[in-house]
Amino acid sequence: MFPMVTGFMNYGQQTIRAARYIGQSFMTTLSHVNRLPVTIQYPYEKLITSERFRGRIHFEFDKCIACEVCVRVCPIDLPVVDWELETNIRKKRLLNYSIDFGICIFCGNCVEYCPTNCLSMTEEYELSTYNRHELNYNQIALGRLPMSVIDDYTIRTILNSPQSLIKMGKPPLIKD
């Protein structure tokens, strides 16, 4: 054939192919028009976390036996466990437990392999600070309950229980 005719045929095929691609893209766009937006206005609306969300780690000091399994299974050897051996009872006594959330990758291995279940994952994800040293949580900060639990009226904390109020010399709160 003539070179000019084959050039027009190639141009025509490329034009048809380009129109088909544009049509497919337009159909994909139209299929998403009727969907609801998924954007969350963050400071004003909070994200509803899933059931298996891995947020900040909660630590219960009384349950920990200082076995250091959490340190061994952590990919970055992050939890710092300080303990001393009680020779008279032949057991370890936990002195200090801390996790630096600036380094933590929130893999959840420490929670999964803990034999006494003293570690658990919370739904708290707002850990931003201006100073990275504030992300180093000790056993007191790790044991603190999230604000969502503290503000829940169905949960009574130990601090507000009638027994603790009597021990502190305050009259117990009576709710009608």
From Swiss-Prot:
Matching Pfam families: Fer4_9 (PF13187)
GO MF term (any one): quinone binding
InterPro entries reported for this sequence: 4Fe4S_Fe-S-bd, 4Fe4S_Fe_S_CS, NADH_quinone_OxRdtase_chainI, NDHI
Cofactor(s) demanded: [4Fe-4S] cluster
Organism (species): Populus alba
EC number: 7.1.1.-
Paired cysteines (S-S): none
Protein name (database record): NAD(P)H-quinone oxidoreductase subunit I, chloroplastic
